[in-house]
Amino acid sequence: MTGIALVPLAIFFVLALAFPFLPLGDRGAYLLQIGFFTLVAGIMALSWDILARSGQVSLAHAAFYGMGAYGYALLLKTGLAWPLAMPLAALGTGMISLILGAVTMRLSGMYFAIATLAFTEVVRTIIQNLPEDVAGGANGLLVPALLGGDSRGQYLLALLLLALTAGVSLAVRTGRLHHAFAAIRQGEETARVLGVSTVRYKLAAFFISSFLAALAGVLYAGKTFFISPLDTFSLANSIAPLTTSIFGGLYTTLGPILGATVLRIAEEALHNVVKNGYLVVYGLVLMLSILWLPRGLMGLLRRGRHGGDV
């Protein structure tokens, strides 16, 4: 990775930082909301991609997202301040993810994906069947507004956490984890021959990925003021990070962020134009894009420069 390769990523963050300070007019609150959820989608996609780099195609991200949201809400109910509740909810999610990682250690491919999907359903069922005075049951749970409902502040916090996620991703790509993950992805037997501790590194990938996804869940809970098992643990929250990463470009830092930005804007545009049928058109556009761009949007960028991947 070279300094040139980091330029597009730096440009993205400069533009994203300037966005909330632009004269957005009467639609300012609406545009900030779109920007906020775009950043959350970027965190989810990038956190999923970090796990995928170790060869694990997970469908448990809805569980990590939901555990972060519910963990944060329950910690706030104890009187804990949000700056403490946020990292603690993410840390708790990371610790629980290690259990999932240990249990599914011998699985791969379709069997691993099914196991992680089942884990999400188990967590959702547990949350839904907790006493209503604890987690709200199937009816959901009210959550205090993050930063008192300040839209600009919420956006900037989401941008900060996306920057943190990008920093972690870059550290993974340039450190020992990168080589270990690549070896495991090529084949665990080969990785063991090379001296890679597959168990340790796969669990590390689980912890890092789930911690970051939980932060996205915290942002969601604090922005929407309300969480429910069906919405928070929905299958869409497991599928979206996967498709976004593929669309943007796997095993890169900029790719999932770029994918989240393009898809979120496209979703809003189609919703305004096509109305009720926008999801069908959105799905077709996404499917065709993946077929025509097997290396994602990053594949297009690579054609125009030779500075390496980000």
Regions inferred by a protein language model and the residue ranges of each:
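Residue-level recognition of pore/gate-forming positions within transmembrane alpha-helices
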Residues: 37, 41, 69-70, 90-94, ...
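Single transmembrane alpha-helix segments in multi-pass membrane proteins
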Residues: 28-77, 103-112, 190, 249-253
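Extracellular/periplasmic helix-loop junction at the C-terminal end of a transmembrane helix
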Residues: 119-150, 157, 178, 275, ...
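Transmembrane alpha-helical segments in multi-pass inner-membrane proteins
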Residues: 206-288, 292
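Helix-loop-helix "hairpin" substructures at the membrane interface of multi-pass membrane proteins
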Residues: 149-229
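Cytosolic-side transmembrane-helix boundaries in multi-pass membrane proteins
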Residues: 1-17, 186-203, 269-310
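Membrane-interfacial amphipathic/re-entrant helices at transmembrane-helix boundaries
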Residues: 1-42, 79-85, 309-310
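Alpha-helical transmembrane segments within multi-pass membrane transporters and channels
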Residues: 79-121, 258-261
